Amino acid sequence: MVKLTTWLKKIGWGETITQRIFCFYIYCILFGSLLLFLPIALQDNYQKVVSYGIDWQGKRFEQKTDYNFLDALFLSTSAFSDTGLSTVVVSKTYSIFGQIVLAVLLQLGGIGFVVIAFLAWRLFNFHKKEQYSFYEKLMLQSERGGSKLGNTSEMILVSIIFLFIVELIYGFLYGILFYFIPGFEPANLFADHAKVSTQLKALVVDSNQTIAAFNDINKAFQAGFFHSLSAVNNAGIDLIGGSSFVPYRNGLGIIIQWLTISQIIFGGIGYPCLFDGFEAIKKKIKYGRHTKHQFSLFTKLTVITNIVVILLFFTLLLMVEFIASDSLTNTIVNFSDEKKSLINTQLQSQSNQAIHASVFGNNPNASRVMQLFFMVISSRSAGFSVFPVASEIQTTKIIIALAMFIGASPSSTAGGIRTTTLAVIFLALVAKFKGQKEVKAFKRSIDQTTVIDAFLVLIISLIAVLLTAVLLPLSMEQPVSFIDALFETTSAFGTVGLSSGATVNIALDPNRNTFNFLALCLLMVMGQVGVSSSVLTFVRKHPKANSYSYPKEAVKIG
């Protein structure tokens, strides 16, 4: 009986800090699932909209199917992990109550459940001088803290206040922009014809119908504040429609893109970096501009790695887009007469250049460059899309998948293996090639345990993502390529939310394969918690210590 009680305590609460945080997350997801499964959370009684838009003939379509608890669990996991993958069109499936539940889950997952509890405790005990315990400090550090325990609480308070202010200001800005900028519903460029590839079928042009938020003050600010909350938490869920930010891919929509980019960076850079920046500004104000702030190794590695990764992937996407013969730009410019006969009848008589402008706007090349830059930033963890991902060629999908796999920074709202992991692995390889015994960066030596952990994170992440990508298509009725399956699993692990269409296929799968739902949910939680913390969940509080050691012997490898 005692053993059973002990086991139940371990399952329900956990022994270690990591186990308890993991349990908090699971309970929040399950509770959110129950709320999203209530009839009050849905617009239509247990029906979900899986696709919505305008077809190539200009007719509005809406595809519905049954809504079940797996959908609620998937959306709750996606929202709490700040991923954005969805089996439904959120704005057409959930009621105001359901959208509020999603917003709360986004905020809880982005800021952190333990951090929210800490803020609530500070709010209701502001008049007391009571100090929180060493254990509570460890809980905060484990979820959103940096490497130093002493300044964890101050760092979290500063970062949260800053992010809340950003959410409010940007919410008002988005509301104004959504109200005044006429975002048009995207219409399919091609007919659903057997001769047209999946890539070309996904191409869109603007229809003559605006989105619901345009000239509607209530819907504009509702969508604005929801988007602000989603963007700063790097979630990728929106209330615009079924095509993410495609209505704002050109023209004045670029203003919204730049605002979103800045929020994604604020949310994904990590609390330690935000606090470091705050400390630097505070010192400049207090002691003058001649004072030099000593930035932490974490901040230096994070900022430099982020810049390098963004520039690298942006350059790769530009090269593929403007050099590859089968890229979207070159494909449209070189449309054959056979292809043109299958497109929207209103565009058939136009030149290829005019059709190209219809897809990419009045400044096609500039718009396409901006779209690719937005996709690079968004693919780091956010998941907003200004172009249908399914229309991209396989090479582009692989590049975006690599960016999603890396993710953004630790102690942030982002997922993936994290930028610091990549930086440590790169520095370790450089040290090995130079014959150095220590891994060094900015006049600091990185602990050997950290180096080993970085390689473990990489290996475990690769195994989890690749294994799921191999198994995912096997149980689906509709054919899905390995690249698309890999894109989907990487998106889940990186808590990004970009989709090549596989998630919709899962939602439409008549077999209702539970494995696909749960596998992606598991990857989303792993990406949110972090691989290191996920592995530590299974570590005992007091591991059995060996009182002996064996002789060492070299083993030939490679």
Curated annotation (Swiss-Prot):
One of its GO terms (biological process) is potassium ion transmembrane transport. Signal peptide: none annotated. It holds the Pfam family TrkH. It is a multi-pass membrane protein. The keyword Transmembrane applies. The keyword Cell membrane applies. It is found in: Cell membrane. Its main location: membrane. One of its GO terms (molecular function) is potassium ion transmembrane transporter activity. One of its GO terms (cellular component) is plasma membrane. Keywords: Cell membrane, Ion transport, Membrane, Transmembrane, Transmembrane helix, Transport. The chain crosses the membrane at residues 21-41, 69-89, 100-120, 160-180, 220-240, 251-271, 303-323, 386-406, 413-433, 454-474, 479-499, 519-539. Belongs to the TrkH potassium transport family. This is Uncharacterized cation transporter MG322. It comes from Mycoplasma genitalium (strain ATCC 33530 / DSM 19775 / NCTC 10195 / G37).
